[in-house]
């Protein structure tokens, strides 16, 4: 993949771009195998990868420049703006949208936030595309509500130019820190969730809910989890750190007792919407802390699925699972190092199978799916 900004030394987000893609994959596989070298793995499955470019469904654009000539992209370490509208990670459909958004910023009078001067209003634009129907979700991250009325008044023009814009919101982030978004989200359209569909499973993305940024590889990840679970005829399961419910909704059959737990109420609203659409009657989702929920339960399901943030599931949850001993633990991780530490704490389990999914080409990051079975 060629990137003009990388070649010019202006962007280093893809830190492995100089490395041939087959070598990237080999290095990731070697890294994972070295982390699990102290464990007996019954089956290593071939790694899964997708496109090298144009795979990202989401753009996070810093807004800089002036209101008349806004720039969308990032700030270089020296503070100068870098235009990323032509970033090769984005699908071709994004660049014309960015062109319209630049015009809209000027029309609406949304002054870009100046980090050095701590002045201005518009900090970021967050754009997400549905691979299911091509609809877009757009979030304006603002310092305050000062320009909200101007933004709202100008929206009809934007919606006329971009009819695929289905979900629009404003996020208020008043802090002068490198924080992408604040807690307060103000919906600006009646529709508040972007529909997505992986493997015939309907999923929904709300402004403040996490969703995978590489849809083709994410679809493979979910399909693999479903296959592994179905092979063991699991009748009851927990989906902890469940997000919008992608794993649990893929794995649950009509009779499966599924409980999904996620701290984000926005994500849980998405999961419930999907479960209702699928007609699943034995499924419940709740906005709770996954560790607190689990450790307060006196009974355990046959399978516990965990998909934690980079920090892993931690000692408390590992100790609880070791004590309660579900038949299976299905661990999906975006940080194999913390996953390996957690697995070392899970007493009484062996690794049945492991598979790497290259969700993040041109970086050292990857996703890994591991099935742990209770030793008999």
Swiss-Prot record:
Keyword Methyltransferase: yes
Substrates-to-products reaction catalysed: uridine(747) in 23S rRNA + S-adenosyl-L-methionine = 5-methyluridine(747) in 23S rRNA + S-adenosyl-L-homocysteine + H(+)
Ligand binding (S-adenosyl-L-methionine): 212, 241, 262, 307
Keyword line: 4Fe-4S, Iron, Iron-sulfur, Metal-binding, Methyltransferase, rRNA processing, S-adenosyl-L-methionine, Transferase
InterPro entries reported for this sequence: 23SrRNA_MeTrfase_RlmC, MeTrfase_TrmA_AS, MeTrfase_TrmA_CS, SAM-dependent_MTases_sf, U5_MeTrfase_fam
One MF term in the entry's GO annotations: iron ion binding
Top-level taxon of origin: Bacteria
Binding site for [4Fe-4S] cluster: 3, 11, 14, 87
Function: Catalyzes the formation of 5-methyl-uridine at position 747 (m5U747) in 23S rRNA.
EC number: 2.1.1.189
Protein name, as recorded: 23S rRNA (uracil(747)-C(5))-methyltransferase RlmC
Entry-linked PROSITE patterns: SAM_MT_RNA_M5U, TRMA_1, TRMA_2
Listed GO biological process terms: rRNA base methylation
Catalytic residues (positions): 334 (nucleophile)
Organism expressing this protein natively: Yersinia pseudotuberculosis serotype O:1b (strain IP 31758)
Protein family per UniProt: Belongs to the class I-like SAM-binding methyltransferase superfamily. RNA M5U methyltransferase family. RlmC subfamily.
Family matches, as HAMAP family: 23SrRNA_methyltr_RlmC
Catalytic EC class: transferase
């Amino acid at each position: 993949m060629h990137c003009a900004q990388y070649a010019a030394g202006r962007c280093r987000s893809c830190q492995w771009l100089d490395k041939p893609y087959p070598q990237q994959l080999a290095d990731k596989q070697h890294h994972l195998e070295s982390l699990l070298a102290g464990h007996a793995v019954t089956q290593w499955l071939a790694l899964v990868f997708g496109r090298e470019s144009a795979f990202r469904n989401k753009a996070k654009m810093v807004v800089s420049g002036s209101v008349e000539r806004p720039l969308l992209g990032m700030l270089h370490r020296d503070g100068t703006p870098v235009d990323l509208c032509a970033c090769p990670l984005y699908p071709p459909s994004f660049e014309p949208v960015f062109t319209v958004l630049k015009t809209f910023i000027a029309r609406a009078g949304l002054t870009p936030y100046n980090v050095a001067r701590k002045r201005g209003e518009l900090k970021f634009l967050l754009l997400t595309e549905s691979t299911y129907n091509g609809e877009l979700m757009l979030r304006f991250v603002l310092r305050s509500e000062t320009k909200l009325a101007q933004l709202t008044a100008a929206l009809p023009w934007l919606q006329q130019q971009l009819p695929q814009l289905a979900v629009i919101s404003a996020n208020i982030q008043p802090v002068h820190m490198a924080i992408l978004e604040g807690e307060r989200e103000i919906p600006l359209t009646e529709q508040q969730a972007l529909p997505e569909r992986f493997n015939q499973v309907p999923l929904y993305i709300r402004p403040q809910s996490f969703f995978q940024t590489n849809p083709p590889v994410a679809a493979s990840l979910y399909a693999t989890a479903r296959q592994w679970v179905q092979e063991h005829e699991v009748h009851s399961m927990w989906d902890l750190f469940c997000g919008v419910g992608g794993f649990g909704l893929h794995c649950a059959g009509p009779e499966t007792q599924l409980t999904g737990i996620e701290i984000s109420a926005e994500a849980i609203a998405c999961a419930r919407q999907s479960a209702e659409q699928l007609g699943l009657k034995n499924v419940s989702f709740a906005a709770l802390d996954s560790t607190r929920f689990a450790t307060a339960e006196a009974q355990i399901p046959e399978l516990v699925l965990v998909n934690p943030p980079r920090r892993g599931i931690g000692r408390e949850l590992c100790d609880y699972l070791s004590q309660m001993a579900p038949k299976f633990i299905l661990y999906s991780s975006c940080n194999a190092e913390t996953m390996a530490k957690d697995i070392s704490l899970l007493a009484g389990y062996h690794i049945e199978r492991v598979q790497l999914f290259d969700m993040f080409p041109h970086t050292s990051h990857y996703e890994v799916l591991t099935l742990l079975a209770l030793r008999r």
